[in-house]
């Protein structure tokens, strides 16, 4: 069982580069594609000089990108999203440490019976992994995670309700396959992230290597809510709940994301957020 809680706060964050195309359509009137591209780099710095109360000077950087391609025609909708995040922090007296690392790909195809209803018959694909090695600081001798170790793949069918007026989307799937990949043999041998660990003889020699994948069939619920609650203050709330039918049904894996984005101007912003991940395995 693992439980992770990440709380991050950027009091003064400067966006050095950002590009956003909220709704761009091809000049060709028959195109049904829209796209959104957003890339930014936030940096924050704290400096102490002869500060008697104590504290360490620190500098942090966060690269983030959000890209989407949406096809919509009549009763059909196909939404494709790519989200990347990579953050580093350097404090006096400490080595460079990673603060955020994520690659997320989502693709949802939906079909509704008419153009009035908000309900879609949907098929959904999700893929999540990371860029670089993760460590249990200050120990950086052995990685506790790597690219594709783990990686999570969700593939299933269900129903989605998308309401622009209510600024939310939720998806329910009674049949979703979840595959966990651990493409690092050392971590797989340890049984990391729920895969079957290696078997050893009485002398400690490996008899059977740990498995590098694990597949489950279960129930999936996802919810996404985004709204400008007041001018220049945006709220983003995401939750993913999954329970395996075969192993310990009722024990729920949770991935919860909360972000409050406060925009001062084009260059200065503050973000307050939290992420909670609970995996029963």
Residue ranges and their predicted role:
Residues 49-55, 90-96, 140-146, 206-211, ...:
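Extracellular loop and loop/strand-boundary signature of outer-membrane beta-barrel proteins
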Residues 41-47, 73-75, 84-90, 125-133, ...:
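Transmembrane beta-strands of outer-membrane beta-barrel pores
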Residues 41-43, 63-71, 105-111, 127, ...:
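Residues on the lipid-exposed face of transmembrane beta-strands in outer-membrane beta-barrel proteins
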Residues 37-39, 80-82, 121-125, 157, ...:
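Membrane-embedded beta-strand positions of outer-membrane beta-barrel proteins
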Residues 57-63, 99-105, 149-155, 213-219, ...:
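Residues that define the transmembrane beta-barrel architecture of outer-membrane proteins
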Residues 75-78, 115-120, 167-169, 232-235, ...:
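Repeated loop/turn-to-beta-strand initiation elements of outer-membrane beta-barrel proteins
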Residues 29-45, 76-78:
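Transmembrane beta-strand segments of Gram-negative outer membrane beta-barrel proteins
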Residues 247-281:
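Predominantly the C-terminal beta-signal and adjacent terminal strand-loop region
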């Amino acid at each position: 069982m693992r439980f992770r809680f990440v709380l991050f706060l950027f009091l003064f964050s400067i966006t050095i580069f950002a590009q956003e195309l909220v709704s761009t359509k091809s000049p060709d009137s028959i195109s049904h594609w829209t796209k959104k591209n957003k890339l930014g780099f936030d940096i924050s710095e704290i400096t102490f000089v002869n500060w008697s109360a104590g504290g360490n000077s620190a500098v942090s950087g966060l690269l983030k990108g959000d890209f989407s391609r949406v096809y919509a025609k009549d009763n059909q909708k196909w939404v494709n999203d790519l989200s990347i995040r990579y953050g580093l922090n350097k404090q006096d007296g400490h080595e460079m440490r990673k603060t955020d690392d994520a690659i997320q790909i989502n693709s949802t195809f939906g079909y509704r019976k008419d153009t009035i209803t908000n309900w879609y018959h949907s098929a959904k694909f999700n893929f999540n992994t990371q860029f670089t090695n993760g460590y249990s600081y200050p120990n950086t001798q052995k990685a506790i995670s790597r690219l594709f170790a783990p990686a999570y793949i969700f593939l299933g069918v269900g129903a989605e309700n998308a309401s622009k007026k209510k600024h939310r989307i939720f998806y329910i799937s009674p049949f979703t396959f979840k595959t966990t990949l651990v493409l690092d043999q050392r971590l797989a041998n340890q049984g990391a992230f729920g895969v079957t660990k290696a078997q050893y003889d009485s002398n400690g020699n490996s008899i059977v290597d740990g498995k590098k994948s694990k597949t489950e069939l279960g129930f999936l619920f996802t919810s996404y809510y985004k709204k400008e609650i007041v001018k220049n203050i945006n709220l983003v709330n995401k939750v993913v709940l999954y329970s395996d039918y075969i192993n310990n049904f009722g024990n729920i894996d949770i991935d919860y994301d909360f972000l409050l984005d406060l925009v001062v101007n084009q260059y200065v912003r503050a973000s307050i957020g939290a992420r909670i991940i609970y995996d029963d395995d």
